[in-house]
Amino acid sequence: MANKVFRLLSDGDPATGMQPSDFTPPETFTSDDHRELNHTFFASADESILSGVWESAPCKEEIESYPVHEMMTVISGSVTLTNADGQSETFTSGDVFFIPKGTKCTWHITETLRKFYMIAA
């Protein structure tokens, strides 16, 4: 990708929008809606850094060790994260949060979530 400043758009690429993705294990969806969409605006040459926009239908997943460092900004929807010690935090539209790599948590999307993300492997 070219090195230049760019705007992250909440609907993905203006020409193609967001595309189906499969980051979420199918068995974790909590309804018949298994929709998941993504658009990556930036990927470093080795893909150790990614930024984009992602959307998922409601799901609940126990994560033993979060696989990346990730900063997120919620565009719409809601997600509740529960740490290994039982502390829960709910994030909604406009909230910005960070999950360090290796974090044990429960990821519970209670209504369709759309977020901007920046990932560092």
Segments (PLM) and residue ranges:
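A short hydrophobic beta-strand segment most commonly corresponding to one strand
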Residues: 111-121
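Short hydrophobic/aromatic-rich beta-strand segments that constitute the beta-sheet cores
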Residues: 63, 81, 115-117
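Conserved short histidine dyad/triad with adjacent acidic residue
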Residues: 40-43, 47-66, 100-101
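Conserved catalytic-core motifs of eukaryotic protein kinase domains, centered on the activation segment
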Residues: 84, 110
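A short, N-terminal "cap"/entry segment at the start of jelly-roll beta-barrel domains
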Residues: 1-48
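Short, exposed beta-strand-loop hairpins at the edges of beta-sheets
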Residues: 105-108
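Short acidic-glycine-tyrosine-enriched beta hairpin
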Residues: 85-101
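Short, conserved beta-strand element in jelly-roll/cupin
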Residues: 65-81
